[in-house]
C-alpha cells in the first residue's frame, strides 16, 4: 500500500478569518431577531476582539458595551475599555459590582462559607454577577448578549459556566488566540 502524501496547509489568512467571523456574528444576530448586542468590556483582548468583529458586522451604534468592575479591577482596565469604545464608536456603560459582590460574600461567609478559605468560588462569583447584570440589560433592551469566551480558555477550563460563557456564541470561540496579544 502506498502512503499518501501529506499536503502542506497554507498559513492562516487573517483577513479571510476576520471576514468569516464578521459574517458569523451578523448572521447569528439577525437570524435570532436581534439588531443590537451587549458586550461585557473588560479592557482585555477577548472583549476587544468581540467588539471589533461586532463593529464591522453591525456598526458601532448597535453595540452597547458595559464595564462591570469590582474592587479587584485596575484603573487601567477601565481606561482600556473606554479607549476601545471611543475607537470603535460604541456606547460604554459602567456598573460597579463591588457592592453586590461584597453583599454576596457577606451572606455566604456568615452562613455556608464560615471558617472556609477564599478560593475559586469567590472568583467565579464575580463573573456570574456580571453575567446576571448583562443578561438583565439584554432582556430589558432586547440586545443579544455576546459571549467573550474563547477556545484557549475553554480548553483548559479557565472559564466560568453561567459567567463569561454566557451569551450568544461568537464564532471566534473556535480559535486559539496567541498568548502575545496579537490578533
Across the structure, where does each feature detected by a protein language model lie?
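Conserved small/polar residues in nucleotide/adenosyl-binding loops
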Residues: 173-179
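A conserved beta-strand->alpha-helix junction
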Residues: 62-67, 73-121, 127
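Short beta-alpha connecting loops at secondary-structure transitions
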Residues: 6, 65-68, 114-122, 164-172
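RNA-binding accessory domains that recognize and position tRNA/RNA substrates
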Residues: 1-38, 56
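Glycine/Thr-rich phosphate-binding loops that ligate phosphate moieties of nucleotide
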Residues: 134
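Conserved helix-loop functional segments at active or binding sites
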Residues: 26-35, 56, 60-63, 103, ...
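ATP-dependent adenylation/pyrophosphate-handling site
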Residues: 35-41, 45-82
Amino acid at each position: 500500500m502506498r502512503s499518501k502524501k501529506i499536503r502542506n496547509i497554507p498559513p492562516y489568512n487573517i483577513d479571510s478569518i476576520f471576514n468569516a467571523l464578521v459574517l458569523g456574528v451578523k448572521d447569528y444576530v439577525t437570524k435570532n431577531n436581534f439588531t443590537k448586542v451587549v458586550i461585557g468590556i473588560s479592557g482585555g483582548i477577548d472583549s476587544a476582539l468581540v467588539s471589533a468583529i461586532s463593529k464591522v458586522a453591525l456598526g458601532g451604534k448597535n453595540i452597547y458595551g458595559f464595564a462591570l468592575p469590582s474592587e479587584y479591577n485596575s484603573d487601567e482596565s477601565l481606561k482600556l475599555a473606554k479607549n476601545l469604545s471611543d475607537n470603535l464608536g460604541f456606547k460604554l456603560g459602567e456598573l460597579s459590582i463591588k457592592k453586590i459582590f461584597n453583599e454576596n460574600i457577606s451572606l455566604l461567609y456568615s452562613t455556608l462559607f464560615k471558617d472556609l478559605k477564599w478560593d475559586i468560588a469567590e472568583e467565579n462569583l464575580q463573573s456570574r454577577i456580571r453575567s446576571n447584570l448583562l443578561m438583565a440589560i439584554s432582556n430589558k433592551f432586547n440586545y443579544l448578549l455576546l459571549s467573550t469566551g474563547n477556545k484557549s480558555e475553554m480548553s483548559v477550563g479557565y472559564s466560568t459556566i453561567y459567567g463569561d460563557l454566557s451569551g450568544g456564541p461568537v464564532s471566534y470561540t473556535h480559535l486559539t488566540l496567541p498568548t502575545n496579544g496579537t490578533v
